[in-house]
């Protein structure tokens, strides 16, 4: 595998300023293509209004070779909710730890303004019956502490199993944001479970999280020792392995498919071939995904969505290596027909467990297969400028893959490419 050029998060400010000062003032790369016309893929964080969820169509249509790659958030959210509900039904006789007739759960919310986080919160509440309508949609707001069931953003639900009725209650939920402003924060989730268990630990029967990073933090801090099932999302390697130790389950968002699509749409644009090549239509090497099984495509949204799979005690051994390339799209491209090209790609938070431990290793496996030389830029998870300051000379690159800190901030990147 060729040596990867990975740029550190703590790059010196003087270097960043130097890059800006020496950067192209709007010209293209040596290929003669203007920066604004180069292939661009948004991934993992879809350009959208963080308050309303409305897609940023301007960003998604930045040029003719712009796409988004992610996963089907609603389908995955529904799967997670169903997974939790199925577990409760199968274990109703033993899951009520204190025998009070109330099956209480706590929920770690990643980012109240992130579409995926919103969908997952809604999916769990809808499946468990604790959802409350707010302006025509399920309220995804944090409930705070709700031990007495008086919160307005959720409601108590009733579940009958084998003739016995149980109350299902969201005991507490909060956004896991740290003091520096970083969301989806695992350490904050670990602290939260400590606070919750100190106050009402005997009432917590299930732990649910918007992702595995936060879920594993709560599992390791408390749930594992107390044999409380914990459910996450992402199918990170440590979470999948933890299923053997009592972790309830997780959702694979088919990161192997997402990583492939992230680079494949760029490769196709750079080669001047149909965007579906090697995706829904086999390429010369035989790479091909199955639409409706592995992914779906929305032409209106210019978006590719990988489809999700529930990972539980029944099938977790099939998901133990989260960085393995997908067999269907594992064949090397011919370098004479797909010559090496240079790609600028950022990861919004270098400390994010899923992105750094699963997604980036997959990208690094696929960039070799697709003959792409990728510069990986690690962000701090807090500010766009920490990333954009290192896009000082876009003229050096043939294509771009962007993972924003906030979904609202696409213009922070396109304004640079438009110069």
Can you describe what each PLM-predicted range is?
Residues 1-10:
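Bacterial Sec-dependent N-terminal signal peptides
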Residues 18-21:
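C-terminal motif of bacterial Sec signal peptides marking the signal peptidase cleavage site
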Residues 23-419:
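A residue-level marker of the well-folded mature domains of exported/periplasmic proteins
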